[in-house]
A protein has these predicted regions:
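GST-like domain detector, emphasizing the conserved glutathione-binding G-site
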Residues: 1-46
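Short, hydrophobic secondary-structure boundary micro-motifs
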Residues: 4-8, 42, 72, 118-123
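All-alpha amphipathic helical-bundle segments outside canonical DNA-binding/catalytic cores
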Residues: 8-14, 68-79
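Short helix-capping/linker segments at secondary-structure and domain boundaries
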Residues: 27, 36-38, 89-99
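Amphipathic alpha-helical packing segments from all-alpha helical-bundle domains
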Residues: 47-65
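GST superfamily/GST-like fold recognition
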Residues: 73-94
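C-terminal end-helix/capping segment
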Residues: 99-122
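Carbohydrate-binding/catalytic loop surfaces
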Residues: 125-129
Length: 129
């Protein structure tokens, strides 16, 4: 079958690896956010926050080094996962990652213009036609 899939057979394991790294970015970004916002300042753990931040930034730089794997003509689940992880990181933490990752930064600027990404922003309603 020539039907397109979100999980391409030829790149299945590369795709799953990229998804796992994106999931790790999200987990660390959420943990960092919880530590910074839900825990009283005098009980926060600076070393834990630093570990979360380092894991996030190292993972994003790893993706930048594998950038060519994200540049396929059809939309794949690894692209969606990475875009969501980068967008959330920018929203809740920092966009400083973009300084060392110009390819990912430019790619994210393009992918976030797509309707499916715009429609999932907080507070946005989208009509499907």
């Amino acid at each position: 079958s020539n039907k397109e899939t979100l999980y391409p057979k030829k790149r299945y394991w590369e795709c799953m690896t990229m998804i796992s790294v994106a999931n790790g970015i999200m987990e660390n970004a959420v943990n960092r956010f919880i530590e910074m916002s839900a825990i009283p300042e005098n009980e926060q753990r600076p070393k834990a926050i630093s570990r979360y931040e380092n894991k996030i930034l190292r993972s994003i730089e790893w993706i930048e080094n594998k950038f060519e794997e994200l540049t396929s003509d059809e939309m794949t689940m690894d692209q969606i996962s990475v875009a969501c992880a980068l967008d959330y990181t920018t929203f809740r933490y920092t966009k400083d990652w973009s300084i060392n990752c110009p390819n990912l930064n430019q790619w994210l600027e393009q992918i976030t213009k797509l309707d499916f990404m715009k429609s999932t922003l907080p507070g946005v309603s989208f009509k499907y036609e």
